[in-house]
Every structure is written in C-alpha cells, then in structure tokens.
C-alpha cells in the first residue's frame, strides 16, 4: 500500500497541469495504471481473475 501522504498529495490539483499523475484507486500504486479502469496492472489482474470486472477475459489465440 502507498503512503497516505502521497495518495493525498496526488489527489490535489497540481500548480502545473503536467505534474499531475494517476494512481491506482485500489492500492495507490503510481506506476502501470490503466486509465480505463483506474487500477494498476496488479489489481487489474487480480480483479479480472476473480471476475469482478465485467467484459474482461483472459486472451487466448
């Protein structure tokens, strides 16, 4: 889990727009966040395997 101070800092609007960044809504991780879901790759994978994300399925070809 991310530190609460860093999560709160990311939630504030930055002075300059380019300084803003996304964080995972579930765990607060700052890297590898999918904008469509608002989740990091780890949480996205866990929730997809658990069937908590409708329309997401494991690819197979």
From Swiss-Prot:
Gene3D superfamilies: 30s Ribosomal Protein S14, Chain N (4.10.830.10). Binds 1 zinc ion per subunit. Zn(2+) binds at residues 24, 27, 40, 43. Pfam families: Ribosomal_S14 (PF00253). One of its GO terms (biological process) is translation. One of its GO terms (molecular function) is zinc ion binding. Its cofactor is Zn(2+). The keyword Acetylation does not apply. Keywords: Metal-binding, Ribonucleoprotein, Ribosomal protein, RNA-binding, rRNA-binding, Zinc. GO terms for cellular component: cytoplasm; small ribosomal subunit. InterPro entries: Ribosomal_uS14 (IPR001209), Ribosomal_uS14_bact (IPR023053), Ribosomal_uS14_CS (IPR018271), Ribosomal_uS14_sf (IPR043140). The keyword Metal-binding applies. Binds 16S rRNA, required for the assembly of 30S particles and may also be responsible for determining the conformation of the 16S rRNA at the A site. Part of the 30S ribosomal subunit. Contacts proteins S3 and S10. Belongs to the universal ribosomal protein uS14 family. Zinc-binding uS14 subfamily. This is Small ribosomal subunit protein uS14B. It comes from Mycolicibacterium paratuberculosis (strain ATCC BAA-968 / K-10). The gene is rpsZ.
């Amino acid at each position: 889990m991310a530190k609460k101070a860093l999560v709160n800092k990311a939630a504030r609007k930055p002075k300059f727009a380019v300084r803003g960044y996304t964080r995972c809504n579930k765990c607060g991780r700052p890297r590898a966040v999918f904008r469509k879901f608002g989740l990091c790759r780890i949480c996205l994978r866990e929730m997809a395997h658990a069937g908590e994300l409708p329309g997401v399925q494991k690819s197979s070809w």
